């Protein structure tokens, strides 16, 4: 019987020859321990260089979280509030437009907005907010909503999700967030986000968005109660969608922030992913998602030092400047508000690479 190291060498050699990684093979990579993780990271970095080149990219963006009031009770969330809780906010039209105008004055090219599911929101609420933003910041790329918000708006308004997406696009939606994916395995979803749309509904709405010319990101939230096999299944679902639609702009792994979350306090989740897992998530994703050009590391979730390591394990993008971020902060993250491009450049140059500013759709600025 071949040793694990021999198996790994053979598999990585096959990948260089054009072999497409299978789910069982991806699972083997996720289960790797010891110095072999560096071998996987190096192979992923070579793939990154071949697919995306050497530049480390970023987008100048600003986040707007409109409200933290939410009808859902996702176990992984430390951001949402219920009626009567302390600290509830809902930004007015004036406040939202002030934030959008500020973003425009900062030279931001993208405004990103995803919020709680406000009990009074309808599809028209989202559409109206998008009009406010694009009115205050004309020409901005609005990266907003996600399949859960689309489904919620449709249900509240008696509309189809296709009608909601069409209305959002007409109001200025340029691309959609691929969040609310978490782990696309329903038994896991029942534990961490009971009440959210099931896997097949998330997939359907993503495909629908792509069919309407609305590109989306793709995400995974890992490091809680899922297994390595669950992670592989999730990646396989994303790869199959991309084979069909080519509508994903990037893959963004989101490491679970545990500190202030119900599932951690209740003993249903562990204390987040380890550094080994963070590194392998980027590397295995680069090797498995062979139809994705761009893989991002989240400095918000992992901190800048771990994010830098991800850039030599298959990632090519550092995400955005953000300016403000409430969801990860609510869960206990400390690196959430703003990352200066000068610091991004220092990180990139430390690896012998150059920083390049991009648009949301990865055109270079």
Curated annotation (Swiss-Prot):
Keywords, in A-Z order: 4Fe-4S, Iron, Iron-sulfur, Metal-binding, S-adenosyl-L-methionine, Transferase
Domain of life according to the entry: Archaea
Cofactor(s) needed for function: [4Fe-4S] cluster
EC number: 2.5.1.147
Cofactor note: Binds 1 [4Fe-4S] cluster. The cluster is coordinated with 3 cysteines and an exchangeable S-adenosyl-L-methionine.
Pathway in which the depicted protein is active: Cofactor biosynthesis; coenzyme F0 biosynthesis
GO molecular function ontology, one term from the record: 5-amino-6-(D-ribitylamino)uracil--L-tyrosine 4-hydroxyphenyl transferase activity
Similarity comment: family membership: Belongs to the radical SAM superfamily. CofH family.
Role noted for this protein: Catalyzes the radical-mediated synthesis of 5-amino-5-(4-hydroxybenzyl)-6-(D-ribitylimino)-5,6-dihydrouracil from 5-amino-6-(D-ribitylamino)uracil and L-tyrosine.
Protein's name according to its UniProt entry: 5-amino-6-(D-ribitylamino)uracil--L-tyrosine 4-hydroxyphenyl transferase
Species name: Methanosphaerula palustris (strain ATCC BAA-1556 / DSM 19958 / E1-9c)
């Amino acid at each position: 019987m071949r040793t694990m190291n021999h198996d790994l060498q053979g598999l990585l050699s096959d990948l260089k020859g054009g072999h497409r990684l299978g789910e069982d093979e991806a699972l083997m990579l996720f289960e790797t321990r010891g110095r072999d993780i560096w071998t996987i990271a190096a192979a992923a970095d070579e793939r990154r260089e071949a697919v995306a080149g050497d530049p480390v990219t970023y987008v100048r963006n600003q986040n707007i979280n409109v409200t933290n009031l939410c009808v859902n009770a996702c176990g992984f969330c430390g951001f949402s509030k219920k009626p009567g809780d302390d600290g509830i906010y809902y930004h007015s039209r004036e406040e939202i437009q002030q934030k959008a105008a500020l973003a425009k004055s900062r030279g931001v090219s993208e405004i990103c907005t995803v919020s709680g599911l406000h009990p009074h929101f309808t599809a028209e609420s989202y559409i109206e907010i998008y009009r406010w933003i694009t009115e205050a910041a004309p020409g901005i790329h609005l990266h907003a909503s996600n399949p859960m918000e689309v489904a919620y708006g449709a249900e509240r308004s008696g509309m189809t999700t296709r009608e909601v997406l069409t209305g959002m696009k007409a109001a200025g939606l340029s691309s959609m967030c691929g969040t609310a994916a978490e782990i696309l395995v329903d038994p896991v979803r029942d534990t961490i986000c009971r009440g959210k749309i099931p896997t097949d509904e998330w997939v359907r709405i993503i495909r629908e968005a792509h069919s309407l010319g609305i590109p989306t990101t793709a995400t995974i939230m890992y490091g809680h109660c899922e297994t390595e096999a669950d992670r592989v299944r999730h990646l396989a679902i994303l790869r199959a969608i991309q084979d069909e639609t080519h509508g994903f702009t990037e893959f963004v792994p989101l490491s679970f922030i545990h500190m202030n979350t119900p599932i951690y306090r209740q003993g249903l989740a562990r204390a987040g992913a380890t550094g080994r897992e963070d590194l392998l998530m980027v590397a295995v994703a680069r090797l498995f998602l062979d139809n994705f050009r761009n893989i991002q590391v989240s400095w918000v979730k992992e901190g800048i030092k771990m994010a830098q390591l991800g850039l030599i394990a298959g990632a090519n993008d550092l995400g955005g400047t953000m300016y403000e971020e409430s969801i990860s902060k609510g869960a206990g993250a400390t690196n959430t508000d703003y990352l200066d491009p000068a610091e991004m450049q220092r990180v990139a140059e430390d690896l012998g690479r150059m920083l390049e500013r991009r648009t949301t759709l990865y055109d270079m600025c």
